[in-house]
Amino acid sequence: MSVITPINTVLCPSARAGLAAIWAVPCNEVIEIIIDPLLHMVSNVILNVGVEWQRIEFEPGTAYLMQEKLIAKGYTEYVKQTIYFEEYGLSPTMRNALEDLNGNCCMNVIAEDEAGNYHYCGISVRDESELNDNLRTADGTSETGADPQTDVAKYTETLACVCDFYALITIDPIDFNPLFWTKPDDEFWTIKGN
């Protein structure tokens, strides 16, 4: 006879299925992404001057990051990255933010999971000189809540792409501040003034 141990919040405090928030920025606003090839981590991102990450926070159980390995022609591996979220009771501010999001055919997204890890979604690094980003809005629906018997006011959105690998681990986008960093010839980043 098998013994099945239930998985609950006590035994699994760092579950990563759900998302707490995402930060998004259009691809054309990203100047450079600094990637550590050994650690498979994004260590810094430089945006155009005056551009900031746009944050969307989620209620528990309303947003998810899914990563599915795909194999093409029997040997080439890809990963389908999908961010799915629902927003209930749309305020004018949230509606405007989502309309701006839908206006972008390409974006970079940092996703914070429920365990506090950050994932840089939507990029593929072919070699040191080539980086592709192709995350875009996919399926989306909205309900007005006009008929309380059949629907509620909510917006559902999916961001999707196919990349060469799983989303890279990164750091809190609040800490990304290229105005304080400089890149000398030896390729090391230092704080300006030091």
Mark where each language-model region is:
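Solvent-exposed edge beta-strands and adjacent loop segments
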Residues: S2-Y84, E128-T150
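Hydrophobic transmembrane signal anchors and adjacent membrane-proximal interface regions, especially
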Residues: I4-T5, T9, A24, I31-I33, ...
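Intrinsic-disorder/low-complexity regions
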Residues: I7, C27, I35, S43, ...
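Generic recognition of cysteine residues
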Residues: C12, C27, C105-C106, C121, ...
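Generic structural motif
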Residues: C27, L38, G61, Y88-P92, ...
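Structured, beta-strand-rich domain cores
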Residues: L65-E128
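Mixed-charge, glycine-accented linear interaction segment located at domain edges/termini
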Residues: R126-N194
